[in-house]
Amino acid sequence: MRTKRYTVAIAGLMPEIVTQSILIKVWEKAAKKVCASTGIYVNAWLNESYFLCGDKREPELDGLTANFIIIWNPVEVESYEEFHEAFTQVVNGVRDILGNPYVWITIDDIEFYYFVKC
């Protein structure tokens, strides 16, 4: 099916403070809050990486980067507009909890297939 994939990169995180466990809890807290008001839970995959930007950008960008990958599943949420609004609210909630760090978001059109467990 045709759908959208969002990638949310949050840069400049301090690995001595922000761990994978903390990132998971932060996303879950924001997603549960949005779900309570909209009925839409925004699932995400979390990957960690390291951003290297050298002297061209602000030095605090160097460091741990959290990459959340989100796929809109039209079978679960029919309205793209409603999903996008819920997604935006979750990302804003995550940013608030983390102290408004640098964030990049990409949105890609993709073909998405999945198989349920039998």
Name each model-derived stretch.
Residues 9-11, 47, 71, 106-108:
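A structural detector for beta-sheet-dominated domains
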Residues 5-8, 66-67, 103:
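Hydrophobic beta-strand segments of well-ordered beta-sheets in folded domains
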Residues 1-24:
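Short, extreme N-terminal segment that most often corresponds to the first beta-strand
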Residues 23-28, 62, 83, 87:
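Glycine-rich, flexible loop segments associated with nucleotide phosphate handling
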